[in-house]
């Protein structure tokens, strides 16, 4: 990165410690004076027209908050890595398209959340709803941000013409799971719905959310990462006890948006179960 410092319009921000993704990204966003900000992982590679396609999509509708790239596996370029993220009724945050053929994703569409690994965000809406939550050291911070935008009445969309190639997990060494990722998941899986669902939704969704969390807890313990998971869980409860959840106040005008999110998360159980029970089991592409 230092080799770029002599280039025009380039600013390098160096931190003396590992601050986590959210804190570091917020530093850059705070410096930005443009209409949009773009995030791009250090383990990703963009097509030449990637940025132009993101800008074209965002310019078409002022209600669009985030534009998601079509992220493709770097070493298996016929397969997608991420075509947008979603949250289920049980609180699972998942990728769309992981391991499926890129040819399936050709149309622009609204998505629940944009992956922050390669996405464009409208700066004015960031200023309104706030940046990335720095309590999410890594993982789910982009889902939290997109969910807040949904709750405020804005949209996130997939732009399949904006293609990039991603070496998944290169930054953390976690293509699937490790202790670090397990700890982050244990904490952020609790914070994500508590931050973004109003009280009535949390009451209505208590049983599926509790069941989902117990299933996750069982899975991580079975895979040998129970200690890390439990550590993350205790961190979440410590934040709640300290009153540092950062939950946005309920606004009556946002009620239609909350209802839409509730219905969307219920519906998202369909693609989630289809992927887990059919696509993965039979190795369909």
Model-based region annotation:
Residues 80, 92-93, 100-124, 143-145, ...:
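A recurrent flexible, glycine/aromatic-enriched loop bordering the glycosyltransferase active site
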Residues 202-285:
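Non-catalytic, C-terminal membrane-associated alpha-helical segments of glycosyltransferases
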Residues 44-87:
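Conserved donor NDP-sugar-binding/catalytic core segment of glycosyltransferases
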Residues 14-32, 42:
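Glycine-rich, basic loop-to-helix element that forms the pyrophosphate-binding segment
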Residues 54, 112-163:
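A short, conserved alpha-helix in the catalytic core of glycosyltransferases
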Residues 37:
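Short aromatic/hydrophobic "clamp" motif used to bind/position activated sugar donors
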Residues 1-17:
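Acidic donor-binding segment of Leloir-type glycosyltransferases
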Residues 162, 175-202, 223-243:
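Catalytic core of nucleotide-sugar-dependent glycosyltransferases
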